[in-house]
Every structure is written in structure tokens, then in C-alpha cells.
């Protein structure tokens, strides 16, 4: 797993080529939030850049995935996320799912960070099993006697 610092450094270097393009928001900086190892999945976080916000996934080296440019599904307890696979000399194999692009709706880093933190909260949330309907005693007896519930 690459370090948060290495991934941020890579995207800061990419940012030097993106600066000046209409999609580039100079009020924002590169920041990888929530970067953590996830058992059986690899590592995952939300990457903020001045031009996009992505769910950033680095699968384990042994993972069998399609080739670069194709799509793969990241399965987490909160749901399935479709990601595009990338391969880079310095970062190796990783995948991303676009959350926002361009980033002009964010006036500052704090706003982008707040959205990224909410995405992390949702992505790492356990899905809740459906709750059984509350059964009253009256409904239970009605059902037992063959009546409608």
C-alpha cells in the first residue's frame, strides 16, 4: 500500500500540468482523506484535487482485476462501487470512482473536505439489515387465526 504522502505528491505533480485549465479550482489543494487499509479490499480513501474528487482504491497486489482503463467493482458492506482501473509507474495499479468534477462548486478546501468526509462516512458505514415490521399482539392473533395482518 502506498502512503498517503506518496499519493498526494503524485497528484500535486499532476496538478502542475492541470493549473490554468478551466476545470482547475485554485482555491483547492490535493488531499487524500480517510486513507486506510481495508481487509480483503486493499486501501481506500477520498482524493480531493483542484480538478476532481474521487474515491481512490488501491487493490491488493494479488487481486485479479481487468486491465487498465476497464471497470472493476469495489464491494464493501455499504454497497458496490464501480471504479475505473489505472496503472502508473510510480503508484502501480489503482482504481478510482468519480465523485465530483469539475470542482468549481467548492469555494474552499473546508467545503471539499466536508463532502469527502461525508462520502467516507457513507462508504465505510455498514449496511443495515431490513428491520422486521413491528408486530402487535392483536396483529399476531389476527394472522394466527387466518385474518389479514
Curated annotation (Swiss-Prot):
Pfam families: NiFe-hyd_HybE (PF11939). This is Hydrogenase expression/formation protein HupT. InterPro entries: NiFe-hyd_HybE, NiFe-hyd_HybE_sf. Belongs to the HupJ family. It comes from the Bacteria.
